[in-house]
């Protein structure tokens, strides 16, 4: 305080005292009583009383006559009325009591006062409104440099209330006392001395040790905190507060009055005032600083570098703690937190970076001197944090350090740009937001930057980058494939990748095909990418959409071509187009074979396997390029769908050879044994037998469309089935017709035409036609048709009557009964002159024939019954023999003699049937018939198995037909005879002879 | 300030500002709203009592809404206090706030009437209401006679509650309490005066 101010204050104080005195005498003007909407209490009472009296009299007047109301209703009405009136009086009673209380307590004055205030308020409002209106109307009026405060003073006082500093404006002598300067100076010096003595007697805390006494006051200076000025008036008085300056921020507005009050209180009361004052001020300043940090952070977070929600803080004024959170959008940095608080040891404000991952030995986590420095501290923390994350990522070996980057804030990541080249991509952390970003990003990188920032730990981030790399490789490969004419299918998506992704590798499948490929077949490129390498695996697979879900139907697991990404080139892609087709078809065939459940195996041309392949395939391949040839071994049994019986005819495995260059498909098979079929070439089957290996054959087709390959397979199968059926039938025929007359006229896949009759007996082209009726899989039946002029044609009827004869039986039967049918013709040949005897053969059944001889000359006829019976020779051997007897019993002599052909009967009876001749014949037996078997049951077996005789029979000609009874080998049974089939023809001829001789 | 102005007007020439000193000068409003009017008018005590908050900032005891305690000194036995909320209070304002002189008997100050006569006339202006022909007491007794004797149970289910009459039929009532209040000698008294400090204050005020 300066001396020249002192008179002013004194003057002020005196005026205050004066006004107080003035007030004591002042009687306040009466407050106007509120009268609006108010009625005197007496009037209220009177109103209610009048109303009540009128109500009551009204009631009685209305109810004096009974009217329609019952007494109860009237009573109720009366009671309700009384109740209502009584209640109103109750209210008035209470009102009177309240009014009394209010009056006693002067409460009405309070109401009046409130009303008065309201009025005053309203007036002020009106004034404001009027002023506003004036302002509006005076828009054009302007006052240069208006001093409204002074203007108001002039308006109110008639003059400005300027400080006169003790001078009298009109120049007259002032009555005011002036203190001489000398006195003031002396007083100040005295004060200095006084203070020096006083301070030396006081305990001074170490923080306040630095002080200076001047101008009648002590000035304590605490560095970076405050400058406190204290003074006193004399030796006995305590110290008083004079002024305080904050040293860290001088512009800060201070509530000096409150501080003064508080400090003076401490100085006055305390026994150790300076200590307490220091403590108080220190705390005060710390609190202030805390608040200033809060303000600074506010500015930083809202408008400064970290604006945009990257930095938030929470200022807890009670606990004196500020919690700062930075990098709010960053997920990978899990704890981004700093806490500003008091350090108890040093009693100063400290900032602690609370990150558990930080290495506290190398990185500072505690910061002092925050004021005006908070931005750079947060910068340092974010930088350190970014470095930590970067170090973490570098440790994963996915990244390289950027040597050109001097600030070492970026990471390099390698991404292939083509198959062979790799480019470095810079990944950086934004220090303000903690978000990763790519340097010069492409669209792909941008989308992945988003994913990278979503990842919450290093591993996730690496995974995202792995996916990024995979995506990139995928797009590179797709581009290459597109350019080389492959078609990448975007539609096909497998539920799970063929090679599942692991922690360190990522895989993705690309399904490609060429235009002319069979549908559903794809080349599957599987990209397997890890941090450092990238491999592409090529497989062939068939993928079908089943009910909207793509399913892998076939996958070549053995022949996986694995190549590194950097080996993939455009030329290779083009070559692949050519070389891959065979494989596709192979797999397609194998898949189809598998689907048909045909056993199959791909044969390779490697040397160790070559001995498995038959030489005829090897030989051909010696000249040809084996690359275009595929050989697949097929299981015969499964190929022909399980007809095991056929295995006896053909070798169990077949070879399918596909030549892609010639577009040929060939099926090779081999017979187990030599058979008749091999010699009868059937052109229509187009089965060719190999020259080198007579048992091997092959079928060949030229394919136009790869999709139809399976058609050829079924064609082959049909042919093969026919071939086998044919072979089977042919074998049977050959074994049954073991004669020179047998000859196959025509051989077609389902028809065999052949001759078996001696040339002179068969006028037709063929004697018999066998049609092989097949269904899809096997031979259903054989249709045997005898030709029109075949003497045995009458058998046809019986064959047709009853189906299901084994063809073996039929052939045998035909061959066996042939002599019977030939007998009449043979008889014509033997007799030179036109015969008088006609022979007729009737067939009763397959077992029984009726032979009739008619002699025109004599006019008699003789018939025989010929039966086919099987004779058991030994236990395991049966033999079919002819049994011949007369149709009529001629055993009675008279019957015999009456018959015109009695002579023939007698002769036949005697020579053919009679047992009496047996003895004589036995003795006459020639040496050639030595093999007479032991007689069983009175029957003598005569071997007829003489090849000479057989030849004789077949070569029998009319010229040397000198047959007589003795040459016929048969078993005589008295009235019948049994003979084998080669004896029947001579026998019948002998009968003919006998009959014609009559 | 007024004093200094007077000094100024004496010392400065009139032309000094564009303000005519002869005109009536501004005088602050009386009473001055800037002053503590409550104190000036001696209303501190009553203001303190009805204040919504106590001196320490806590919420003060609410003012009563029910007038139950105010009518305890009456002879009735009020079980339910008629109020607007329970529908038994009825509307009074239109009865008591009518201010229509034509409907009321007026006493006129006729010339030559002494002040005493006028006051007498004023007092007796409404007596006519209770006398025939306005009120025929004979007719009243006739009608009452028609009503016959009643029993409380009679009014069951008729929408009328006998208790609302507040007749102290069995004589117990609240007489003991009533005496107690009377002994206090205060119409402001409430049954639990001693227990509530808020009410204590009020009573002391008187």
UniProtKB/Swiss-Prot annotation, chain A:
Taxonomic superkingdom: Eukaryota
Cell inner membrane among keywords: no
Gene Ontology cellular component list: core mediator complex; mediator complex
Gene Ontology annotations of biological process type: regulation of transcription by RNA polymerase II
Oligomer and partners: Component of the Mediator complex.
Family of this protein: Belongs to the Mediator complex subunit 14 family.
Protein name per its UniProtKB record: Mediator of RNA polymerase II transcription subunit 14
Organism whose genome encodes this protein: Kluyveromyces lactis (strain ATCC 8585 / CBS 2359 / DSM 70799 / NBRC 1267 / NRRL Y-1140 / WM37) (Yeast)
Lineage: Eukaryota, Fungi, Dikarya, Ascomycota, Saccharomycotina
Swiss-Prot record, chain B:
GO annotation, cellular component aspect: core mediator complex; mediator complex
Segments for region (Disordered): 171-206
Residue ranges the record marks as coiled coil: none
Primary subcellular site in the record, as a coarse category: nucleus
Record's keyword annotation contains Transcription: yes
Family to which this protein belongs: Belongs to the Mediator complex subunit 19 family.
Subunit comment: Component of the Mediator complex.
Protein name as catalogued: Mediator of RNA polymerase II transcription subunit 19
Name of encoding gene: ROX3
């Amino acid at each position: 305080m300066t001396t020249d101010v002192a008179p002013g204050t004194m003057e002020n104080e005196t005026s205050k005292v004066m006004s107080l005195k003035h007030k004591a005498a002042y009687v306040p003007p009466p407050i106007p009583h509120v009268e609006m909407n108010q009625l005197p209490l007496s009037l209220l009472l009177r109103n209610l009383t009048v109303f009540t009296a009128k109500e009551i009299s009204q009631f009685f007047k209305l109810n004096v006559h009974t009217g329609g109301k019952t007494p109860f209703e009237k009573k109720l009405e009366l009671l309700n009325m009384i109740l209502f009136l009584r209640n109103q009086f109750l209210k008035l009673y209470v009102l009177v009591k309240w009014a009394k209380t209010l009056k006693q307590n002067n409460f009405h004055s309070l109401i009046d006062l409130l009303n008065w205030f309201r009025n005053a308020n309203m007036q002020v409002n009106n004034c404001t409104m009027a002023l506003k209106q004036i302002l509006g109307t005076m828009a054009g009026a302007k006052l240069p440099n208006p001093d409204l405060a002074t203007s108001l003073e002039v308006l109110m006082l008639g003059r400005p209330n300027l400080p006169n500093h003790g001078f009298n404006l009109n120049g007259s002598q002032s009555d005011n006392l002036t203190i001489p300067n000398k006195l003031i100076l002396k007083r100040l010096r005295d004060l200095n001395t006084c203070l020096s003595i006083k301070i030396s007697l006081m305990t001074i805390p170490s923080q306040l040790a630095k002080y200076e006494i001047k101008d009648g006051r002590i000035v304590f200076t605490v560095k970076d905190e405050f400058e406190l000025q204290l003074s006193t008036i004399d030796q006995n008085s305590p110290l008083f507060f004079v002024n305080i300056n904050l040293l860290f921020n001088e512009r800060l507005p201070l509530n000096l009055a409150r501080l003064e009050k508080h400090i003076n209180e401490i100085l006055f009361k305390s026994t150790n005032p300076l200590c307490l004052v220091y403590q108080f001020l220190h705390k005060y300043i710390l609190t202030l600083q805390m608040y200033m940090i809060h303000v600074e952070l506010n500015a930083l977070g809202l408008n400064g570098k970290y604006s945009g929600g990257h930095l938030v803080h929470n200022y807890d004024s009670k606990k004196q703690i500020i919690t700062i959170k930075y990098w709010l959008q960053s997920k990978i940095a899990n704890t981004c937190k700093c806490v500003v608080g008091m350090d108890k040891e040093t009693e100063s404000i400290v900032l602690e970076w609370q990150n558990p991952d930080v290495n506290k030995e190398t990185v500072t986590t505690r910061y002092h001197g925050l004021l005006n420095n908070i931005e750079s501290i947060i910068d340092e923390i974010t930088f350190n944090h970014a470095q930590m994350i970067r170090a973490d990522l570098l440790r994963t070996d996915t990244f390289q350090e950027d040597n050109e980057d001097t600030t070492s804030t970026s990471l390099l990541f390698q991404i292939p740009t083509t198959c062979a080249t790799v480019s470095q991509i810079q990944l950086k952390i934004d220090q303000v937001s903690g978000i990763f970003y790519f340097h010069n990003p492409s669209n792909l990188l941008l989308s992945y930057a988003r994913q990278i920032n979503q990842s919450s730990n290093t591993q996730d981030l690496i995974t995202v980058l792995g996916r990024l790399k995979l995506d990139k490789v995928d797009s590179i490969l797709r581009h290459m494939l597109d350019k080389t004419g492959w078609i990448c299918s975007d539609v096909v998506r497998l539920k799970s990748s063929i090679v599942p992704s692991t922690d360190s590798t990522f895989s993705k499948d690309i399904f490609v095909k060429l235009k002319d490929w069979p549908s559903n077949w794809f080349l599957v490129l599987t990209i397997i990418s890890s941090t450092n390498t990238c491999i592409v695996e090529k497989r062939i697979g068939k993928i079908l959409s089943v009910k909207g879900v793509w399913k892998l139907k076939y996958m070549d697991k053995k022949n996986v071509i694995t190549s590194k990404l950097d080996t993939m080139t455009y030329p290779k892609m083009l070559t692949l187009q050519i070389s891959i087709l065979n494989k596709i078809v192979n797999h397609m065939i194998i898949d189809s074979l598998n689907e048909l459940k045909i056993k199959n195996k791909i044969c390779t041309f490697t040397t160790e396997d070559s001995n498995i392949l038959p030489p005829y395939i090897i030989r051909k391949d010696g000249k040809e390029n084996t690359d275009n040839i595929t050989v697949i071994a097929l299981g015969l049994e499964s190929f022909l769908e399980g007809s095991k019986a056929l295995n006896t005819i053909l070798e169990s495995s077949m070879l399918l050879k596909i030549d892609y260059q010639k577009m040929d498909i060939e099926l090779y098979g081999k017979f187990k044994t030599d058979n008749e079929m091999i010699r009868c070439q059937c052109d229509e089957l187009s089965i060719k037998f190999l020259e080198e290996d007579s048992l091997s054959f092959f079928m060949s087709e030229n394919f136009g469309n790869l999709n139809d390959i399976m058609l050829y397979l079924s064609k082959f199968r049909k042919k093969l089935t026919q071939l086998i059926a044919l072979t089977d039938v042919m074998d049977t025929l050959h074994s049954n017709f073991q004669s020179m007359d047998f000859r196959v006229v025509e051989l077609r896949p389902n028809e065999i035409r052949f001759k078996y009759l001696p040339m002179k007996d068969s006028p037709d082209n063929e004697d018999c036609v066998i049609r092989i009726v097949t269904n899809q899989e096997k031979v259903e039946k054989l249709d045997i048709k005898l030709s029109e002029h075949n003497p045995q044609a009458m058998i046809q009827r019986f064959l047709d009557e009853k189906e299901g004869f084994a063809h073996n039986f039929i052939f045998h039967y035909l061959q066996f009964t042939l002599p019977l049918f030939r007998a009449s013709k043979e008889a014509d040949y033997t007799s030179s002159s036109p015969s008088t005897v006609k022979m007729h053969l009737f067939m009763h059944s397959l077992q029984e024939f009726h032979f009739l001889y008619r002699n025109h000359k004599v006019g008699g006829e003789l018939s025989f019954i010929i039966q086919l019976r099987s004779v058991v020779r030994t236990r395991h051997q049966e033999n079919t023999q002819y049994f011949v007897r007369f149709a009529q019993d001629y055993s009675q002599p008279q019957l015999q003699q009456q018959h015109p052909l009695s002579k023939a009967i007698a002769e036949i009876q005697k020579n053919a049937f009679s047992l009496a001749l047996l003895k004589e014949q036995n003795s006459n037996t020639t040496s050639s018939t030595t093999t007479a078997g032991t007689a069983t049951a009175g029957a003598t077996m005569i071997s007829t198995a003489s090849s000479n005789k057989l030849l004789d029979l077949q070569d029998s000609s009319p010229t040397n037909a000198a047959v007589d009874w003795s040459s016929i080998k048969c078993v005589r049974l008295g009235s019948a005879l049994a003979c084998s089939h080669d004896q029947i023809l001579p026998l019948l001829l002998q009968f003919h002879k006998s009959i014609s001789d009559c | 300030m007024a004093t200094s102005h007077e000094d100024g007007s004496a010392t400065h020439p009139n032309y000094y500002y564009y303000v005519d000193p002869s005109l009536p000068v501004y005088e602050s409003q009386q009473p001055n709203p800037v002053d503590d009017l409550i104190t000036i008018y001696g209303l501190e005590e009553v203001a303190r009592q009805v204040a919504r908050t106590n001196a320490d900032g806590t919420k003060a005891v609410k003012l009563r809404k029910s007038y139950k305690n105010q009518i305890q000194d009456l002879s009735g036995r009020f079980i339910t206090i008629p109020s607007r909320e329970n529908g038994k209070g009825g509307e009074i304002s239109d009865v008591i706030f009518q201010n229509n002189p034509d409907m009321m008997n007026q006493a006129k100050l006729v010339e030559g009437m002494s002040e005493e006569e006028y006051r007498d006339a004023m007092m007796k202006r409404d007596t006519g209401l209770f006398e025939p022909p306005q009120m025929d007491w004979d007719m009243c007794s006739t009608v009452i006679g028609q009503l016959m004797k009643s029993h409380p149970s009679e009014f069951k289910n008729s929408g009328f509650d006998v208790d609302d009459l507040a007749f102290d039929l069995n004589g117990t009532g609240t007489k003991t309490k009533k005496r107690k209040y009377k002994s206090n000698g205060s119409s402001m008294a409430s049954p639990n005066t001693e227990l509530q400090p808020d009410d204590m204050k009020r009573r002391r005020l008187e």
